[in-house]
Amino acid sequence: MDSKKFGEFIATIRKEKGWTQAELAEKISVTDKAVSRWERGLGFPDINTIKPLADVLEVSVLEIMQS
């Protein structure tokens, strides 16, 4: 996974849903700072967060992993 592409993917879907970083963070029980780091390409979510993230964004885990 490319962290920059991953971050852009997450940010695009989040914005399409009209959510703030804080709203997405609350839905998956992480901090808004974590979401910010991901979206800026500075890291990835913990493996245990990938499935909940995919679920709330309504995408497959595969789509997230390929982003």
Describe every region a protein language model picked out.
Residues 13, 27, 38, 67:
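Residues in the recognition helix of alpha-helical DNA-binding motifs
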Residues 48-63:
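DNA major-groove recognition helix of helix-turn-helix/homeodomain DNA-binding modules
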